């Protein structure tokens, strides 16, 4: 996804794709599965990827590949969003930014091949940097199974989960450990995020369409009564209707990307003010970069005992200067707006 000055919005859609297209060397934008880390060193540690409320490891939700044209230090640039899988803790959200120059220690200077490479069918549990990844979630794994010394984990919780789901039997079979990674029912379903530019619709056209829809359904009501009804329309109704009108042409969109534009909100409640968005540690302001839409929830299959993680809008704000970080990851800011009981 190309990041530029405020302009047309890019819409993201979830589509199935072969696993090799979602690996790090392909610089993907994707939902679910394990993170396709960009920088392969100095990954966020377990402390940075733990829910602030319940302490459980966060699950990888999605990543967006968003290089900055004209910036040599951000020729490659990705944003990684994580969330807590526990429905009552869905506030546990963290987002990280990583960027690399074209000439770097991890990837070829030339664009990646468009064909599948050999050996890409196995789960990657160790990066080129030597860093080990958790067998359950694909995040940095400083813990090691004390018995086989070959299985690595981000936390005691994930080690226990893997032990219960098969590592207990595989632990003594050293030649099979890397090839026997069970389904831990922790990762979200994996999809590629494909993008297209949003069709430009003039605000006047949208307003006229909304007006026509309303007047068409209320054709017999006197003008004075319509004026009275309009005065009673709440700000909440107006914002929600604007949200619906904005997504009506592409109702399957799961993501809206536009660095420096304004997000669209689903509710008049809990809209952040400038003071609510913390500055980057470098001193620069943070600006809006993308938002995750509630339509993504349909793809996640996150229901558990009748409960599910939920949101209205997840809005991600990043450093306006996209400050240089070497090969490390820096945390950015995400704002969660819930769905209210809007008619």
Swiss-Prot record:
Subcellular compartments? Nucleus
Q: Key word Nucleus present in the record?
A: yes
Organism lineage string: Eukaryota, Metazoa, Chordata, Craniata, Vertebrata
Q: Name one GO molecular function term.
A: zinc ion binding
Q: What is the protein's given name? A: Programmed cell death protein 2
After translation, how is this protein modified?
Ubiquitinated by PRKN, promoting proteasomal degradation.
A single Pfam family it belongs to is PDCD2_C
What gene does the UniProt entry assign to this protein? Pdcd2
**What Gene3D superfamilies does this protein map onto?**
6.10.140.2220
Q: What is the species of this protein?
A: Mus musculus (Mouse)
MYND-type zinc fingers: which residues? 134-171
- The answer to whether keyword Zinc applies is yes
What domain of life?
Eukaryota
* Keyword annotations from UniProtKB, A to Z: Apoptosis, DNA-binding, Metal-binding, Nucleus, Ubl conjugation, Zinc, Zinc-finger
Q: Where's it mainly located?
A: nucleus
What residues bind Zn(2+) 1, as annotated?
Answer: 134, 137, 154, 158
Q: Which GO terms describe its biological process?
A: apoptotic process
Q: Residues that bind Zn(2+) 2, according to the entry? A: 145, 148, 167, 171
Cited InterPro entries: PDCD2_C, Znf_MYND
Main function: May be a DNA-binding protein with a regulatory function. May play an important role in cell death and/or in regulation of cell proliferation.
Question: What are the annotated GO cellular component locations?
Answer: cytoplasm; nucleus
């Amino acid at each position: 996804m190309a990041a530029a000055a405020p302009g047309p919005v890019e819409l993201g859609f979830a589509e199935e794709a072969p696993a090799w297209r979602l690996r790090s060397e392909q610089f993907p934008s994707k939902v679910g599965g394990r993170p396709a880390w960009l920088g392969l060193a100095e990954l966020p540690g377990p402390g940075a990827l733990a829910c602030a409320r319940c302490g459980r490891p966060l699950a990888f939700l999605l990543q967006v590949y968003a290089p900055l044209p004209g910036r040599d230090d951000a020729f490659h640039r990705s944003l990684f969003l994580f969330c807590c899988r526990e429905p009552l803790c869905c506030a546990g959200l963290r987002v990280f930014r990583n960027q690399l120059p074209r000439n770097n220690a991890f990837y070829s200077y030339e664009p990646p091949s468009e064909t599948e490479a050999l050996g890409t069918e196995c789960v990657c549990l160790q990066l080129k940097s030597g860093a080990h990844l958790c067998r359950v979630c694909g995040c940095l794994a400083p813990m090691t199974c004390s018995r086989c010394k070959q299985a690595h984990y981000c936390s005691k919780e994930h080690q226990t989960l893997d032990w219960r789901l098969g590592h207990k039997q595989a632990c003594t079979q050293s030649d099979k450990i890397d090839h026997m990674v069970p389904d831990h029912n922790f990762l979200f379903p994996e999809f590629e995020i494909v993008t297209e530019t949003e069709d430009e619709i003039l605000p006047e056209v949208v307003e006229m369409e909304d007006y026509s829809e309303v007047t068409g359904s209320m054709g017999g009501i006197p003008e004075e009564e319509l004026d009275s009804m309009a005065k009673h329309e709440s700000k909440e109704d107006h914002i929600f209707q604007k949200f619906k009108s904005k997504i009506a042409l592409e109702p399957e969109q799961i993501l809206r990307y536009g660095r420096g534009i304004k997000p669209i909100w689903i509710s008049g409640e809990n809209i952040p003010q400038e003071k609510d968005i913390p500055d980057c540690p470098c001193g620069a302001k943070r600006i809006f970069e993308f938002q995750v839409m509630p339509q993504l929830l349909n793809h996640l299959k996150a229901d558990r005992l009748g409960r599910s993680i939920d949101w209205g809008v997840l809005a991600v704000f990043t450093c306006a200067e996209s400050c240089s970080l070497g090969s490390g990851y820096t945390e950015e800011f995400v704002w969660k707006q819930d769905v209210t009981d809007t008619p």
